[in-house]
């Protein structure tokens, strides 16, 4: 929905290509290079579509900051010949947000939303029902006033990650939040 909205704002065509990354066992069992394997599958599908439509290049949104942290997916970007114009021109995440806001892009202030598979430890099987459970819990916490939240699973332990400045409010609300999260199937919770 968000991509469709932004494409409409930009006057671009929006096309959804379906890829089930979890059909591939090497991705489903969450190896350290999962992002690489996943990006390779996604860009492979996109590249085939681009060739069919005679599109000469594919662009993606890596920025300068992304080049200085662990991003195994960048290897696939390079291998597949996908261009990263923001990074190529040295735009940082903050500069991208500022420019997007100046241009009136509706999602300029939207917090980043990394893949839900990052919420599971390497080697854990990624199952759709687990990802859905995590997504529901994070959505619940966002509705309760925690706009930046990650819920990471470590076996039976769910670790809630929020900015430190929200700890106090979370602790004040724990009598409401914790039972609700436990009812969603999270046995043990940490902050």
Spans of model-derived segments:
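Alpha-helix N-cap and loop-to-helix initiation/capping positions
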Residues: 2, 30, 34, 126-129, ...
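Proline- and acidic/polar-enriched loop/turn elements at helix boundaries
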Residues: 19, 62, 111-113, 153
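Peripheral terminal appendages
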Residues: 132-190
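Mid-to-C-terminal catalytic subdomains of enzymes
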Residues: 87-93, 97-141, 148-149
């Amino acid at each position: 929905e968000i991509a469709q909205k932004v494409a409409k704002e930009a006057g671009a065509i929006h096309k959804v290509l379906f890829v089930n990354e979890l059909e591939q066992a090497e991705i489903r069992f969450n190896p350290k290079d999962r992002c690489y394997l996943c990006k390779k599958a996604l860009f492979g599908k996109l590249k085939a579509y681009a060739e069919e439509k005679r599109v000469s290049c594919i662009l993606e949104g890596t920025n300068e900051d992304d080049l200085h942290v662990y991003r195994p997916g960048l290897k696939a970007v390079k291998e597949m010949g996908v261009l990263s114009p923001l990074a190529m021109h040295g735009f940082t995440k903050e500069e991208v947000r500022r420019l997007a806001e100046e241009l009136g892009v509706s999602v300029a202030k939207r917090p980043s939303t990394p893949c839900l598979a990052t919420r599971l430890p390497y080697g854990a099987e990624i199952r759709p029902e687990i990802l859905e459970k995590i997504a529901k819990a994070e959505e619940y916490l966002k509705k309760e006033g925690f706009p930046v939240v990650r819920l990471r699973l470590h076996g039976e332990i769910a670790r809630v990650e929020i900015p430190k400045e929200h700890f106090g409010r979370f602790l004040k609300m724990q009598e409401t939040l914790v039972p609700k999260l436990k009812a969603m199937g999270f046995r043990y919770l940490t902050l």
